[in-house]
Amino acid sequence: MFTLKKSLLLLFFLGTISLSLCEEERNADEEEKRDVEVEKRFLGALFKVASKVLPSVFCAITKKC
């Protein structure tokens, strides 16, 4: 009987550890997704600014306006 309790306790402990590791991995994946979304938003804003500034810079450099 003691051996059965011991093995069940061991299984419960290992299952708990496994579950906590899965949750940590899931949280790490969610953080990476948020980082990618922020990068996409930053690049979009950068392209908008560049599209407004580059023509005037090109005009000033080549002096063909």
From Swiss-Prot:
Broad class of the protein's primary localization = secreted
Q: Which UniProt keywords apply?
A: Amphibian defense peptide, Antibiotic, Antimicrobial, Cleavage on pair of basic residues, Disulfide bond, Secreted, Signal
Propeptide segment residues = 23-39
Instruction: Give the signal peptide, or none.
Output: 1-22
Disulfide connectivity for this sequence is 59-65
Q: Name one GO biological process term.
A: defense response to bacterium
One GO cellular component term of this record is: extracellular region
Tissue distribution of the protein: Expressed by the skin glands.
Compartments where found? Secreted
Tell me which InterPro entries the record gives. Answer: Antimicrobial_frog_1 (IPR012520), Frog_antimicrobial_propeptide (IPR004275)
Role this protein plays = Has a non-hemolytic activity. Has a broad spectrum of activity against both Gram-positive and Gram-negative bacteria, fungi and protozoa.
The entry sums up its family as follows: Belongs to the frog skin active peptide (FSAP) family. Brevinin subfamily.
Subunit structure as annotated in this protein's UniProt entry: Monomer.
Q: Which named protein is this?
A: Gaegurin-5
Q: List the source organism.
A: Glandirana rugosa
